[in-house]
Amino acid sequence: MTIDTSNEVKAIARYIRMSPLKVRRVLDQIRGRSYREALIILEFMPYRACDPILKVLRSAVANAEHNEGLDPATLVVSQAFADGGPTLKRFRPRAQGRAYQIRKPTCHITVAVAPSNKD
């Protein structure tokens, strides 16, 4: 099975309030899988990162179907990655006038799908 990357279609979710490290753990499981397999994996994994990834995957497939006229049954996850976004910085008051910084990470999730050529 080869992947035709000339017809690659992608979707991006930006500023997701989640650590990119935790999102990558899930993305590694669906990269290279068919759309059908990826859906099943994401539905049953117990991680919080699965919901936004599932949303981005469905958006990428909808883009492929609507914009390129591709059949969802032939689509494979060709690329899946999470880049770090801006970090929200907050402060927690501590004793004697001190304050500790709290970092709330965000990430940008990109999922690309492409049709597979079955040899």
From Swiss-Prot:
CDD domains: Ribosomal_L22. The keyword rRNA-binding applies. Keywords: Ribonucleoprotein, Ribosomal protein, RNA-binding, rRNA-binding. One of its GO terms (cellular component) is cytosolic large ribosomal subunit. InterPro entries: Ribosomal_uL22, Ribosomal_uL22_bac/chlpt-type, Ribosomal_uL22_bac/org-type, Ribosomal_uL22_CS, Ribosomal_uL22_sf. Gene3D superfamilies: Ribosomal protein L22/L17 (3.90.470.10). It holds the Pfam family Ribosomal_L22. GO terms for biological process: translation. GO terms for molecular function: rRNA binding; structural constituent of ribosome. SUPFAM superfamilies: Ribosomal protein L22 (SSF54843). The keyword Ribosomal protein applies. HAMAP family: Ribosomal_uL22_B. Belongs to the universal ribosomal protein uL22 family. This protein binds specifically to 23S rRNA; its binding is stimulated by other ribosomal proteins, e.g. L4, L17, and L20. It is important during the early stages of 50S assembly. It makes multiple contacts with different domains of the 23S rRNA in the assembled 50S subunit and ribosome. Part of the 50S ribosomal subunit. This is Large ribosomal subunit protein uL22.
